[in-house]
Amino acid sequence: MPPHELAALGAAACWAVTGILSQAAAQALGPFGFNRLRQGMVALMLAAIVLVAGRWHGIAAEDLWRLALSGVIGIFLGDTVLYVTLIRLGPRRSGALFALNAPMAALMGWLALGEELSAAAILGVVLSTAGVALAVLGRAGRAGTHRFEAVQGSVWVAVGLGLVAAAGQALGSLI
């Protein structure tokens, strides 16, 4: 198997395991506490990489505000709302909703930045949105027997929160 395919499979596996492991931690620490802990760990890992590599590539001073704004919207707000969604909907549904960040980014780029979307890109947005809707709402009428399928509160409120999380990630990536 080519390395890029292995990397894609590894990333998908990490994404799936992370959603499952994060639910209990987000419930125990709360969305803000869990995100704060996670970002602290990421900062330590980044510092270790910079120390080992011996250098840090600079960012132009005029771009720092964009980086900060992107982080606040995408990582702080988007991820915090994602953890609220994870607690309310479980890892399967929240992960599916969060996958809408790519089609949302494409649509935001088209609307705000004048980017062009090909027919294939539009079809991809429609198909991925329909797939997410089926994954999230397809079992909404059936009571889940597994704790990962249990919904806390209104499904529609949780779906709205998941859409806000995906939109925050999409907007953060465009900035």
Give the residues covered by each predicted segment.
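Glycine-/small-residue-enriched transmembrane alpha-helix faces in small-molecule transporters
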Residues: M1-G33, L44, H146-I175
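Loop-to-transmembrane alpha-helix entry segments
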Residues: H4, H57-E62, F98, A105, ...
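Residue-level hotspots within transmembrane alpha-helices of multi-pass secondary transporters
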Residues: I20, L51, T80, A106-L107, ...
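Loop-to-transmembrane-helix transition segments
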Residues: P3-A11, L46-L51, H57-V81, F98, ...
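Small-residue-rich packing faces within the transmembrane alpha-helices of Major Facilitator Superfamily
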Residues: A16, G40-L44, M104, T129
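Structural motif at transmembrane-helix junctions in multi-pass transporters
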Residues: Q27-G33, T80-L97
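Hydrophobic/aromatic residues within transmembrane alpha-helices
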Residues: A25, F34, T85, L111-L117, ...
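Hydrophobic core positions of alpha-helical segments in small-molecule transporters
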Residues: G10, L37-R38, S70, L97-L100, ...
